[in-house]
C-alpha cells in the first residue's frame, strides 16, 4: 500500500466511526486515553475449537540458574513481573522488512531481562530450523468454516518465540522472506491478507492459554489469562475486537488488556467495506472499522480500516518516538487521516533501542579495523580507506565520505537524495548509496553513479557486510526521510561514531542533537508524488555544511558524543514497562533492573 500522507480529503466524524463531532478532544501526546467506552453486550460463542474454560494462572518455576547456577552471569532476573504477549507480522531475525521486525526482535528480551514473562507471536513464514512443533493445534473460525493452525516454539534470550503455522503463511514465502511477507513483490499485496492476519490475531489469543511452555528457568505452564497483549501495526488491528467478542464476553481473559503500537501510520490496512463480514466480528464493531477516504484503491469511497479499529479498541495507544506522536496528531497530512482518532484516544511515544550486540564496532567481523570510543578517529579513517577501495572510489582519507543506506521507497526519500547529488558535485566529496526496493529508485541511484563515476557509488542489492563497513568508514550519514517514525539507521550510525545529517521528523528529532551528534536539515514535505526543490536545497545545504566540519576537532568531538550514547533497549524497556503497568492487569508487578541474556548458542534453546 503506497503512502497515504498526501490525501487532502478531510474524514468526517461519521466516516471515523464516532457518533458525534463533540466527542473529539485532544487526549494529549502522552495522555491517558479517554474514559472507557461502555461495556459490550454479551458476545458470540468462542470461535476456536479449543478448551473454552479459563486457563490456569501460570506459576513461577523454582529458581534455577541463579548466580553460580546454570548460567552464572548472563541470566534473566526474575520477579513476579507481568505476562506480556507481543503480536506482530514480523519478528527479527526470523522475518523482517523494516523497523517492526527489529522492535519485536529486540524489545522483548529487554522486557524479559527485567523479570517479566514475555512471549512473541508471529507467522511461520519459513521452516525455521530453531523452531520446534509443539504438537498443539487449534481450529479457528474463518468465514463459514474452520482453519487448523499449529504452534511452533523456541526459547531464546529469555523470550518464548511462538510461530503460527498455516499454509496461508508458509506456502507464500520461500527462502528469504524480505518483501514477500505482505505480497509477491514490493508494493503488491496478497489479495487475502485480511484472512492471513485475521488468522494471526485469533491464533495469538489462543497461545497464552493453551501452550504449556517450560523452557524459562523461572516460569512454567501456560501464561494464563492475566495478560497484556501488545499489538503492532494494522495487521493486529482486530485483535482487541476478537478478545472482547470471543473471550471476555464468555468470562475468559476478563482482566486482560491490549496496547496498540503504531510503527508506521502510512500502512493502515484499508479494505472494501463489504469485506467486514469476513472478519467474523459482531456488528457492534463495524463503526470502529468504518472509514471514508479520497482514494480509489482498493475500492472508491467507504472502506474498513484495520489500524483505526486497533487504535479505538485498544486500552492504550503507543508509537515509536515522542516527536512522531506529536506529528501524528498534528493534522491530516502526517496523521494520514487518523489524527482525529488519536487526539481522542491519546498516544504515548517511546523511542526504540537497537541491537547493540549485532552493531558493535569493537567486535564487528565485517569491518577492516575494530575500534571503540578511544580509538575511533584513527580507526574510522582506516576503515574509510578500506571502504573506498572496496567500492572502487579513489582512496583518500581526506575526502569527506557521505553514505545513504535505506529501503528504496518514497518514505526514505531516495529521490530527494538523488536530486541533491548534482548540487554536491562541486564539493570535494564522495557518496556511497546502498539499498534495494522499487526499481525506479534503483535506477535513479545507478544513474547517479553513471553520471559521476569518480565521486558516486550505488549498490542496489542486499549486502549486510557492506552496510557494516559503510557505517565504520563513512564520515556522515544522510537520512532524507519524508517521515520517520523512529529510525534505526541513525542509531546504528551513532553506535559507529558516524554523525547523521537528517531530516527533522519523527524519531530523528528525538535522537539526533544538532551540533552534538549530527545536523538537522529541517522538515521535508510528506508529499511522496513530487520532489520539492526546497527539499533538495535543504539536503544539499546541510550536507555542504556538514562536510566542512569533517576532519576538525569539532567533528572528532561529535564522533565521541555519538559513541557514548546508550542506544540499547534497556531504557526503552523500562518506559514500556511503566506504560503497561498503568493498565492494571491483575498480578502485574514492576520488574527489576536486569541484564539481557546475551545471544549465545547455549541460550538458543528450542522446545523439546
Curated annotation (Swiss-Prot):
Pathway: Glycan biosynthesis; starch biosynthesis. It catalyses: an NDP-alpha-D-glucose + [(1->4)-alpha-D-glucosyl](n) = [(1->4)-alpha-D-glucosyl](n+1) + a ribonucleoside 5'-diphosphate + H(+). GO terms for molecular function: ADP binding; alpha-1,4-glucan glucosyltransferase (UDP-glucose donor) activity; IgE binding. It is an enzyme of class 2 (transferase). It comes from the Eukaryota. Seed specific. Its main location: plastid. Residues 1-77 form a transit peptide. Its EC number is 2.4.1.242. The keyword Transferase applies. ADP-alpha-D-glucose binds at residue 96. Pfam families: Glyco_transf_5, Glycos_transf_1. Belongs to the glycosyltransferase 1 family. Bacterial/plant glycogen synthase subfamily. This is Granule-bound starch synthase 1, chloroplastic/amyloplastic. It comes from Sorghum bicolor (Sorghum).
